[in-house]
Each structure stands twice: as C-alpha cells, then as structure tokens.
A protein has these predicted regions:
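Short linear motifs at protein or domain termini
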Residues: 1-110, 216, 220-227
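C-terminal regulatory/effector modules of DNA-binding transcriptional regulators
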Residues: 2, 27, 179-227
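Mobile beta-alpha loop/short-helix "lid" or hinge segments that flank ligand
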Residues: 68, 72-73, 165-168, 181-183
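Conserved amphipathic alpha-helical segments that form helical-bundle/coiled-coil interaction surfaces
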Residues: 93, 97, 114-175, 186-194, ...
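Short helix-capping/hinge motifs at transmembrane helix termini and TM-loop junctions
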Residues: 109-110, 155, 178-179
Length: 227
C-alpha cells in the first residue's frame, strides 16, 4: 500500500466503529457514485472481497442493500452488475429532487440561523471561485456540501432524512452535470442564498426549483444528444 491508497476496510471499520457490512456498503456505493464502477459493469463478489480484504459475506450483504436502493441489479445465476439509469428514471429523480429542494429552500429562508447563512454564503462563494478556476474535480464535493448545508438550515429532521436517503442516488445522476454546468450552477446557488438571506421564502422556493429544473433540462439534452 502506498501513501495515497486508502486504508483497508478493516482498518477503517476500527477507526469509525461501524459494522463491517456498513463499511463495505459505503465503499461500493462510493465507487458507483464516483464512476469507478460504471453503469452496467459486472461486479464479482470474490474480486471485491479480495480488494477490500474481507470475506464474501459482507460483500453479498452490501450488494443486496444496494440493490434495494437502485444502485445494483442482482441476476439469478449471473451475479451482480451496476444498475443502468434510464432517462425516465433519471427524470423521475430530478422531479422528486425539485419538489424536495424547493421545500428545503423555503424553510431555510424562514428558519436559518445567522451561522447557517454564513456557511451557505461561504460555500457558495468558494464553489463559484472554484468553478471559475476550472477545477472541476472539486465541484461535486462542494455541491454536496452546499446542499447539505441548505438542508440543515431548513431545520426539519424528517425532510432532512428524506433528502439524505436519496442523496447518493441523486448525486450519481448529478455528478456529470455538476462539473459541466460549472459557473451557471454556482450562480444559481448564489441566487438561492440571496433569497434566503432576505428571508424571501417564495423566491427561495422558486430559485431552488429553477436550479434543479435547469440541471434536469441539461441532463436530458445530453441524453438526447447521445442517441
């Protein structure tokens, strides 16, 4: 193992004090979301177990959990493969995210603290500056952080839980768009933050819905162009 390699799953489990199957689940999910495991790619349990330095049992349990969430397809006698996101399914996810994001922004405008607003402003400014430099590799993580802070500012535990359960699946669809939309996306983020700062719940709702709608249209345009 060289200095840049992540530690084995077993070591990370010890550090985080989490069940082995959860650590394996998170690692496989991470590989799918960031594209190391491509849509439609076959997943071999024994190979994955060897790479993660675990037995096949936690790998099998992780794949079953990922199947239930739509990341993996399990085929009888053929094993597992990464799911393929159809255009219809992606559109459904965008519509769901638009509804949730609008509600989150509306509540954030009404309930945010000064500290939460400051953090949103900080990340929005950092994201815009990063997009301006062309450092696209850093944008997905900043985008995730922005939307996490936005959700936290809404101060609604049930809504936060709903968003969290969907966040990785949605990020899987969003990642390419986040990097390619660049400065446009971060201009939209700033407009959401401005509305929240002014306490304008209706405008915050509209800006957030427009932001997700623009991402959806860009994604669908890409899909049509690829045909």
């Amino acid at each position: 193992m060289n200095e840049v390699d992540p530690p084995p799953i077993a070591i990370r489990v010890g550090r985080a004090h989490q069940p082995l199957r959860r650590a394996v689940y998170e690692e496989v999910q991470r590989r799918i979301v960031d594209g190391r495991l491509q849509q439609g790619e076959r997943i071999f349990e024994d190979q994955l177990a060897h790479e993660l330095e675990v037995s096949r049992n936690p790998v099998r349990e992780a794949l079953q959990a990922l199947e239930s969430e739509g990341f993996v397809e399990l085929e009888p006698r053929r094993g597992a493969r990464v799911a393929v996101i159809s255009t219809d399914r992606a559109n459904d996810l965008f519509e769901l995210r638009e509804a949730l994001e609008g509600m989150v922004a509306r509540l954030a405008a009404q309930r945010r603290s000064d500290h939460q607003l400051h953090e949103l402003q900080r990340v929005a400014a950092l994201g815009a500056a990063t997009a301006g430099t062309g450092d696209v590799a850093s944008l997905p993580a900043l985008n995730t952080e922005f939307h996490r802070l936005l959700c936290k500012a809404a101060n609604n535990a049930m809504l936060a839980d709903s968003v969290e359960r969907l966040s990785q699946l949605i990020q899987w669809v969003y990642t390419k768009r986040v990097t390619q939309r660049g400065t446009k996306s971060w201009t939209e983020h700033q407009q959401i933050v401005d509305a929240i700062a002014e306490g304008d719940a209706n405008r915050a709702f509209a800006e957030a819905c427009a932001h997700i709608s623009n991402a959806r249209l860009a994604y669908l345009h890409d899909q049509l162009g690829a045909r």
